[in-house]
UniProtKB/Swiss-Prot annotation:
Protein function: Associates with the EF-Tu.GDP complex and induces the exchange of GDP to GTP. It remains bound to the aminoacyl-tRNA.EF-Tu.GTP complex up to the GTP hydrolysis stage on the ribosome.
CDD domains to which the protein is assigned, alphabetical: UBA_EF-Ts
Family as reported in the entry's similarity comment: Belongs to the EF-Ts family.
Chain positions covered by the region annotation Involved in Mg(2+) ion dislocation from EF-Tu: 80-83
GO molecular function, one term: translation elongation factor activity
The protein, known as: Elongation factor Ts
Compartments it resides in: Cytoplasm
Lineage: Bacteria, Thermotogati, Thermotogota, Thermotogae, Thermotogales
Xref: InterPro entries: EF-Ts_dimer_sf (IPR036402), Transl_elong_EFTs/EF1B (IPR001816), Transl_elong_EFTs/EF1B_dimer (IPR014039), Transl_elong_Ts_CS (IPR018101), UBA-like_sf (IPR009060)
NCBIfam families: tsf
Amino acid sequence: MISAKLVKELRDRTGAGMMECKKALEEANGDIEKAIEVLRKRGIAKAAKKASRETGEGIIASYVHFNKKIGVLVELNCETDFVARTEEFQELGNKIAMHVAAMSPRWVKREDVPQEVIEKEKEIYREQLKDSGKPEHVIEKIIEGKLNKFFEENCLYEQKFAFDEEKMVEDMIKEAIAKIGENIKVSRFVKFTVGE
C-alpha cells in the first residue's frame, strides 16, 4: 500500500499529477527514486507526442551578467499565451538564458549546424588520424565519436545543463513539456560579450 505522504512527496518533487505519482510508486514498489525515473521516462514519452504541435506563443528571456559584460536573449516558444505568462515557463527561459551565458553554445540543435562546418570538422579529425595506422572503418567510427562530442559542446539541446549536469538541456525541456502539457522549444538565442 502506497501512503498519501509518499505520493505527496513525489508530487512535490516532480510536479506530476497525483494518480501518475501513485501509479509510478506502485510500479517502483514504493521506491521514490525509482518512481521519479518511471515518471521521467513517461514524461519524455509524453514530450515526444507533443513535439509536433505548433509553438506560436512564447517569450524572449534575457540574462545580463552582474558585471554587465555578457548578455543573452533566448526565444522560448510554447503553444499558448497562458503558458507563456506562467512563472514556471518564464523561469525556464531565464535558466536557459543563464546556461547560454555560461556554456556559449553556437547552435540550438545539431540539425542547425551548417553542413560545411560538419565537413570541416570531419576533415580536421581525418587529418589528425591519417598517420594512426588504423583501418578506415575504425577511423570512421572515431570521427563519428568526435563529431558527437562536437555537437555536445556546441549545440544547446545536447549540452549538459549548467544547473544539473545529470541532464542535457533537451531533457530539461522535455521534462517541462511533460509537466506543463504543451510543446516547448528554443527557437533561437544570441549572446553578446563586450569587446567581441
